[in-house]
Structures are given as structure tokens and as C-alpha cells.
């Protein structure tokens, strides 16, 4: 796999001087002969669009050089749309249209807010005057798929220029920009990588300052990551590979995922930014071993980077364990790669993963929250519910709920709140808004709801307290049943 842009050139052989204006390179004649050739070709047998169209362009523009670049690696219009260049469509007079577009419907990612989607134009054939860094180019975008099959796509840019060096720089700049992340995360799923902006947005909502953890452990986690990415030269001086691996383990629902997201946010804010490579599954038509190969190649390409394997016990099964260990600690260099793995079941991991320091150097245990942490979590819900005047939630209620949720994970406490609020909403004419679970680890330190509770009788008058006790009882019975099973 290579990150270079697949471009090939036709250079002038006639020794003529470069033309000062792009239009001077075209031969005289009615309309655009290259456009006519494309449409003539598209209505006949299609064998190789590239050869037909490049021949037509060389005939029409004998004084210009030609570069052909694949759209999938060098999307010039997208690069311009991001503000790095400008372009205008060129409309030629003639018997055939100057361009061919297909109007496509783009459905919304979410319909909950009433979004109906939007329309967009897919260019099948287009001709443009393209301007970049003071240079002008005539470019054609051509969908040259040969035959009736939908795959593979053959969408190419044909770049005509009087300055071949500048055109090559444009292709390089566009390809480099296109391969980078732009407020996105690399996510591997179903056998391939995609840039995921939604995961990036989710991580941006998480910060270490707002995560409820033991303060000493939180400081260790933060320093472990920062010190690694700032210690490249130290590792080199010591003669050891610049790589590191951590395992987060413990009961589900106690902050492993939100800690990973907070780290993603922290690393994205660094200068230069540290990208994240996130593994969602190893399922692939080529098999899980091939998936691991592709994943680690991507991590090496973007190193220094943060490589995430959540629920590693379900990802790295016995069938791929040997291959995984070889990628982590084999002959290939993994300099700059910080691997983070999480699991709810450390005992299910092979000792070669969980007990080999050169692969995963340290393990961090995420236990059920203690009384202080549970009370802090209740203050989060107190703040979320503050705008709802129908829910009475004084400070004393936070402590009371924390005391009856011993051995509960954050996720179980969250479920108790959600179930209680839904029950109250079902009896209320004005339903309270269900708080977002994405923020359910936030530590609230201010804006507490005022009001004092004098005794237990006053507490029992609070609808939220009465309902949440019911839900805690139900959840605890379920926990006991699971333990007996």
C-alpha cells in the first residue's frame, strides 16, 4: 500500500516554449473536439476511455503537457471546495453539451430533527478552469468506466498545463491533503478504513477535567500519554523502540471508554495533532489476519498515532492471536504507535497479550466507583435536571442516592436515573427532557441546586427519591440473579 498519488504524464516532445495563457494551447476549430470525442466514444463500444481521451486532448492541446490523476487519490474539486483553490466551469459552444451531471439525493445522517436530506450534482463529465497559487490549469473530470459493471470506478482528472512542475506540485498537495484527517478519526470496520467525523465529535465532548476517576490514577493516565509522545528522543537515546501499550480493564460501565475519548480529545489538541486509528471490528472478506495487516500499516503510516482496540478480548480471537502478536512485537517497526486496549474480562486475554511487558507495558484497573465518586456522579444528574422545575433535586439527595448504590457501576447508576425519570415522565403532563447519556461521566463541581432536607421524612416526600429507590432495588435484584446464575 502506498500513499503516493497514481498520476502519469504526457510531456511535450516538440521543444516549443510554454504558452503564457492556457487557451493558447488549444488548436482552432468549432466547439471542443475533446468533449465531442468523449461523447462520441460514450455512445459506442468502450474499450479504454483513458487512451481515447488522452489522445483527443493531445490533439486538441498540442502545446500543453498533460497529467492524469485518479479522483480517489487526488480530488481537485474537493480540494478547491475546502478553500485551497478556485475553479469555474468552462462552457463551450457546440452540438454536444459542455458537461454531464447527475442529480443525486443525499439522505440525512439523522432524521430526528426533520432533516429531509439534500440534492447534489455528481459530475460525470466536466471541464473547468482551475486556479491554484497563481497558476491556471484546464482540467477535465471524466467518469471513464468501461463496460456495464459498477466496479471499478474510473474517475480521473485530466490536467492540462504550461507548467508541468506546478501541476505536479498541485497533484502532490491535493493528494497529501486528501489523505490527512480533517476533524476526523480513522475507523476500521467491515474490511476497510473510513474517516469518521461523528466519532471525532463525540471525543471532543470528553475532557479529562470532567471525567470521574481516582485523582492519582487520572494523573498517571494523562502523564503516561503525554510523556510518551514527548519522549521520542529519549527512547532513541536509550536504544529502545518508541512504542507503548496499555490495557484498561475492569467491570463494564466504569469509565474505560470515556477515558479513551478524553485521551483522543487531548491528543487531537496537541500541536502537531496526534491522530487516532480506531478498530471497530476485524471482519473482512479477506479474513481477520488481512484486517490486522491493513490496520497496522495505517498506524505506521500515520505515526505518531493512538491505536485503539476496544473490547480486545472479542476482537483478538485465538485464530488471529499469533498474527496480532507478531504485528505488535514482530520484525516491523512500530515507532510512534501508542496502543490502547480495553476489556471487561482480563482473564479471557491470552497471557502473551496481558502479561508481556514489551507488548502491553501496563494495566489500569477501573473498579466500581466509591461513595465519593458516586455522589459526584449524582451531582452530574442534578445539574442536568436543574432547568426542569418539576424535579426537586437538593444536595442531600445526591448523598442519599450514592449511599444506596454501593457496588453499582456508573452505567448502573445511569440506568437507575433514566428509568426513574421515565417513570416520573409517564405520570407527568410536562415530560422532562431525557439527559444525554454521552455526557454521563461529567464531574459537576458548581451550580448545585439549593434547598435543605431536614430529615428522612422530608427526603421521602421527593418524587425522584421515591422512584429511584424502586429502580435501584430492581437493578440490585437483577445483579444478584446474575451472580447466582
Regions found by a protein language model. Name each.
Residues 2-230, 243, 485:
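AAA+ P-loop ATPase mechanoenzymes
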